[in-house]
């Protein structure tokens, strides 16, 4: 349960902005507000999570294709450097799920944020906010998942550099 009063006290504000923030989070399906019970962090069923990840994968592929088509050489160089950082972080023996997730999110932000389609970017970011705590940190905590992700990074960056939209989006 999320206590409006406790949150307001912690941040030194009245309950009104806290209530408004919780309402906005409810619109994003990050929290659920129940009458006479208050707000709580929203949980998702396996089916809902699976559906979110399927949609996110489609949006990611399209976003990468659009980035490959529209990006400047400088944007591509930045993405490549961020991809190298994912590989460096992922190979670290003491890497945490949080650190690996942050590295992959940096690449994703570069690609999706510069794909040239504001609606796709907004939808992707909203879906990421909903699912991040369920997926990124937990999944990126496993060595097997990190190896899978790292296996896609270099081929995707090479496809982007070659302006091969289809190959880049498929990875």
Model-inferred region functions:
Residues 1-69, 74, 78:
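Short linear motifs at protein or domain termini
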Residues 20-24, 34-35, 50, 84, ...:
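Short, flexible segments with low predicted structural confidence
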Residues 45-46, 135-139:
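Short alpha-helical transmembrane interface motifs in multi-pass membrane proteins
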Residues 46, 53, 101, 146-150:
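Short, solvent-exposed loop/helix junctions and linker helices
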Residues 73-137, 149-159, 167-171:
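Conserved amphipathic alpha-helical segments that form helical-bundle/coiled-coil interaction surfaces
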Residues 141-145:
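Solvent-exposed loop and edge beta-strand segments that line ligand/cofactor-binding
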């Amino acid at each position: 349960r999320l206590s409006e009063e406790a949150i307001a006290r912690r941040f030194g504000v009245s309950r009104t902005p806290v209530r408004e923030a919780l309402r906005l989070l409810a619109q994003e399906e990050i929290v659920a507000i129940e009458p006479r019970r208050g707000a709580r962090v929203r949980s998702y069923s396996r089916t809902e999570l699976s559906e979110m990840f399927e949609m996110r994968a489609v949006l990611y592929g399209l976003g990468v294709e659009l980035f490959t088509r529209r990006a400047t050489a400088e944007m591509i160089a930045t993405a490549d450097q961020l991809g190298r950082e994912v590989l460096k972080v992922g190979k670290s023996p003491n890497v945490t799920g949080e650190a690996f997730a942050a590295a992959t999110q940096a690449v994703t932000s570069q690609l999706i944020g510069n794909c040239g389609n504001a609606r796709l970017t907004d939808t992707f970011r909203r879906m990421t906010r909903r699912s991040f705590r369920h997926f990124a940190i937990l999944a990126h905590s496993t060595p097997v998942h990190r190896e899978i992700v790292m296996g896609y990074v270099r081929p995707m960056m090479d496809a982007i550099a070659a302006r091969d939209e289809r190959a880049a989006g498929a990875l």
